[in-house]
A protein has these predicted regions:
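Residues forming anionic-ligand binding surfaces in small-molecule and nucleic-acid pockets
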Residues: 72-75, 134-142
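Mixed-charge, glycine-accented linear interaction segment located at domain edges/termini
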Residues: 148-175
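N-terminal strand-loop-strand beta-hairpin
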Residues: 1-124, 168-173, 177-193
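Short coil/turn motifs at secondary-structure junctions
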Residues: 15, 146-148
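General beta-strand recognition
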Residues: 68-70, 128, 140
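Active-site ExK catalytic segment of metal-dependent nucleases
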Residues: 9-11, 140-144
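An amphipathic alpha-helical core segment
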Residues: 126-134, 144-146
Length: 193
């Protein structure tokens, strides 16, 4: 998206990812396949997990030796559904000094999300097929278009429509993300689309 500090995305389980993969192989542009290890932290003076839904996530990522530092603040509608977040991210030359800084500042480690991610682009979407250790397979779609004035709820609806048109069968959406799924499996509320 043109405003690089806003992220519009959905994360879903699909009944059948094969039609999606076949569609992307024919019509999309394959970008990469990466092993990503994401470590999530909370601040010593402010517990991100104290609120529901959890809105803030602080992450360090190791993507096969390419490192990044990321903060997300999700915005939820009155029904607790997220359609976009404020996102700030930067590359890191070396992740270990940052981990030492976090430790010195008493940041609390929360969870590690270990996944294999295959990424394609198709029109205004980046489509990722994720195999997440201990959670299973997911599809994540992010808006990468240039229009800054798009309606996030409309765009996420178009993402679901895209998956339906491709023929993925039942689409089960969560609004909380992988770290929440791992930390609080008994609090999950899925929505069939």
């Amino acid at each position: 998206m043109a405003n690089k500090n806003i992220e519009i995305e959905i994360q879903v389980n699909v009944e059948n990812s094969k039609p999606l993969i076949e569609f992307l192989e024919k019509n999309g542009n394959f970008q990469s396949e990466k092993h990503q290890v994401d470590e999530y932290f909370s601040l010593a003076h402010r517990d991100f997990l104290a609120t529901r839904p959890v809105a803030e996530w602080l992450r360090l990522r190791d993507a096969e030796g390419k490192y990044s530092f990321n903060y997300k603040n999700w915005h939820f509608d009155k029904n607790g559904k997220s359609h976009y977040c404020d996102e700030f991210e930067t590359k890191l030359e070396n992740i270990e000094p940052v981990k030492k800084i976090f430790s010195a500042l008493n940041f609390k480690p929360l969870v590690v999300v270990d996944k294999l991610r295959k990424i394609w682009t198709y029109k205004d979407f980046e489509v990722a097929i994720d195999s997440v250790k201990s959670l299973g397979d997911f599809v994540e779609i992010e808006y990468i278009g240039k229009d800054e004035k798009v309606n996030p709820e409309k765009v996420t609806g178009e993402m679901v429509d895209f998956l339906k048109k491709v023929g993925c069968g039942k689409i089960t959406r969560n609004y909380v993300g992988y770290p929440f799924l791992m930390l609080f499996p008994n609090e999950l509320k899925y929505e069939v689309q």
